[in-house]
C-alpha cells in the first residue's frame, strides 16, 4: 500500500478540486441566470436610448457560448467524479501498476484543470458583463 499513498493523496486532492469545481458551476449558473435577466432589461434600455448595440452582441455571444457548453461541463463534472471514485477503488484493489496509475491520474488532473479553467472563464465574463450593464444604466 505504501506505493499507492502518493496516488491516494492525489486522488484526495482531485476530489477536493472537483468539489470546488461543482461550487464554481453553481456560481456560473447563478451568474448566467442573473445575466439573462439583466440582458432583457439592458436590451430595452439600449433600445429606448438609441445606444449602439455591439455590447449586446458581445453579451449575447457569452450567454450563447455558455448555453452551448453548460450541459457538456455538467456531464464532464459527473464523469470526472465517477472516474476518480472508480480509480480510487481500483487502486485500493491493486488493479494498476505505477505507470497506469500515473497515466490515469494525469488524465484526470488535466480534465479537472480544463473544467476549472472553463468555469473561471465564464464566471469572469459574466461578472464583467454584469458590471458593464450596471455602469451603462447609471449613465
Which residues does each PLM region occupy?
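Immediate post-signal-peptide N-terminus of mature secreted/exported proteins
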Residues: 3-56
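Generic preference for well-ordered secondary structure
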Residues: 2, 19, 23-26, 50, ...
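Primarily heptad-repeat coiled-coil rod domains in cytosolic scaffolding/tethering proteins
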Residues: 6-9, 13-16, 54-57, 61, ...
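Generic low-polarity alpha-helical segments
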Residues: 1-3, 39, 127, 139
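Extracytoplasmic electrostatic interaction patches
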Residues: 68-139
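Structured domain cores in non-transmembrane regions
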Residues: 40-80
Amino acid at each position: 500500500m505504501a506505493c499507492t499513498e502518493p496516488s491516494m493523496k492525489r486522488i484526495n486532492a482531485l476530489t477536493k478540486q472537483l468539489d470546488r469545481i461543482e461550487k464554481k458551476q453553481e456560481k456560473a449558473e447563478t451568474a448566467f441566470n442573473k445575466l439573462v435577466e439583466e440582458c432583457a432589461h439592458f436590451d430595452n434600455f439600449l433600445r429606448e436610448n438609441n445606444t449602439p448595440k455591439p455590447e449586446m452582441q458581445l453579451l449575447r455571444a457569452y450567454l450563447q457560448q455558455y448555453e452551448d457548453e453548460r450541459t457538456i461541463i455538467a456531464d464532464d463534472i459527473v464523469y470526472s467524479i465517477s472516474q476518480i471514485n472508480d480509480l480510487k477503488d481500483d487502486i485500493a484493489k491493486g488493479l494498476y501498476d505505477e505507470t497506469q496509475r500515473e497515466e490515469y491520474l494525469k488524465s484526470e488532473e488535466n480534465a479537472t484543470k480544463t473544467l476549472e479553467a472553463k468555469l473561471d472563464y465564464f464566471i469572469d465574463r459574466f461578472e464583467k458583463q454584469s458590471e458593464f450593464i450596471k455602469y451603462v444604466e447609471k449613465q
